[in-house]
Amino acid sequence: MLENVKKSFFRVLCLGALCLGGLMAEQDPKELVGLGAKSYKEKDFTQAKKYFEKACDLKENSGCFNLGVLYYQGQGVEKNLKKAASFYAKACDLNYSNGCHLLGNLYYSGQGVSQNTNKALQYYSKACDLKYAEGCASLGGIYHDGKVVTRDFKKAVEYFTKACDLNDGDGCTILGSLYDAGRGTPKDLKKALASYDKACDLKDSPGCFNAGNMYHHGEGATKNFKEALARYSKACELENGGGCFNLGAMQYNGEGVTRNEKQAIENFKKGCKLGAKGACDILKQLKIKV
């Protein structure tokens, strides 16, 4: 009898320890986010929401952000842009950079909140200050386009420089184009080429295409067909029609490479399919069907 009581008491202690351990685990916000991410990957969005809610209540910024994503996408909950904005705001207050950026997007487009360009700029600026490249690029784009603020190429250069420094490929390409044209900064072809090259390294196809053009024509560097071919080839691999067309043209004309009409035609075909009109035109001249 006494032995049975001891066993029962031991079981209660063990169960108590398990419960305590569970509570402790639930109180670890980062672990909660990890569990939420696991549930999300398994497409159990309802369970993911529960974990993210608990993490957010414990002021874990990524928990609030992920909760905002669920409401924005309508996963595990009814789609609610107002709630998405609310949770992005909480994440941003807790210095989660992408939360600031996406909140900026909502204010810029007026989704879930009243459209407010000044607030969009404020949140993009905070994202950029938190070293989120897309936040810097968004600011650069706004000042570059001049649709909702007075166009300011100097500020565009400032923010695209920050974006490029944070390895945003598109930001590097646009920065290169500003150096190329001398907008907001003195014209500097060497800096333009360096920016395009970095963009290409970051797998931005227009950056590869533009770098290829500069090497091909000797702008910002000594004319170098080998480097031009390499950039056009990478642009083509990244589905840039102009890159495929220019690569094909160099192969067809034997520039920097042994003439290879067969390979050139294949690249013209790919370029045409990707929307490069010049590639389509040359195929017509050669009487070759795409």
Curated annotation (Swiss-Prot):
GO terms for cellular component: extracellular region. It comes from the Bacteria. Keywords: Antibiotic resistance, Disulfide bond, Hydrolase, Repeat, Secreted, Signal, TPR repeat. It is an enzyme of class 3 (hydrolase). Residues 1-25 form the signal peptide. One of its GO terms (molecular function) is beta-lactamase activity. Its main location: secreted. Coiled coil: none annotated. Pfam families: Sel1 (PF08238). The keyword Disulfide bond applies. TPR repeats lie at residues 29-62, 64-98, 100-133, 134-170, 172-205, 206-242, 244-278. It catalyses: a beta-lactam + H2O = a substituted beta-amino acid. It is found in: Secreted. Disulfide bonds join 56-64, 92-100, 128-136, 164-172, 200-208, 236-244, 272-280. GO terms for biological process: response to antibiotic. Its EC number is 3.5.2.6. May hydrolyze 6-aminopenicillinic acid and 7-aminocephalosporanic acid (ACA) derivatives. Belongs to the hcp beta-lactamase family. This is Putative beta-lactamase HcpC. It comes from Helicobacter pylori (strain ATCC 700392 / 26695). The gene is hcpC.
